[in-house]
Amino acid sequence: MDDVRTVGTGPHRVLGLHGWFGSSQGWGQLPDYVDRSACTWAFPDLRGYGGRRDEAGEHTVAEVARDTLAVADRLGWDRFSLVGHSMGAKYAQQVLVDAPDRVRALVSISGVPAGAVPLDEQGRSLFTGAADERANRYAIIDMTTGNRLPAAFVDGLVQHSLDVSDVEAFRDYFHAFCDEDIAAAVAPVADRVPVLVVAGAHDAALGPDAAKATWLQIYPNAELVVLAEAGHYPMYETPALLVAAVEEFLARV
């Protein structure tokens, strides 16, 4: 499956859903550090990204969830844990809604919450312009990593997003993760699985305070881990610490 990157051969099966600027190949060093004997990880491309860049789609929350379950079926996975980065965490929640009996655990890394994301006019303009403007993509990544990292680091993430994503799909996914509200659908299944919420202290958009106001309000049993030296992209900024936190959690569920 060219659109799914797999790592490891362990018994605990994990599906990783990438973020807006990511792809199946855009997980930083996380795949390098995972315990390959404990878990089998699968990182699919969303429609419009990577191996599916030219595949048409609606680019909605519901569609991503359907596609994710289809990937699990292709892999022969009846049960699995979900790890979602950024917008991928919102889509992972819809998978939980659609198939709660198949989800073993849920991990949010800098995750977009279930509800709609409130943005002021300036913020919305910045994000909606990112589909067409490289400078907007740079500004978003720089801001969400604390305006503290080398320009080459930020520009590398920008270039990856430009290389792997279709512009129209990228544009559509903003509306999916920002405007769609699935909180009411999530509420009835919020206590069905263990949940880990990982937030970077330098993430100006979805940091610890945002996580406490959203994820921890919806999921009564959620655990919060704050990575003190990370922003929105801990798989690039502090990958070893991220993997340690995620694997400690997955080993318990």
Task: Please give the residue ranges for each predicted region.
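Conserved loop-alpha-helix segment in the C-terminal half of the alpha/beta-hydrolase fold
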Residues: 196-230, 236
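Post-His helix in hydrolase/transferase enzymes
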Residues: 236-248
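Alpha/beta-hydrolase fold catalytic core
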Residues: 1-15, 33-40, 77-78, 146, ...
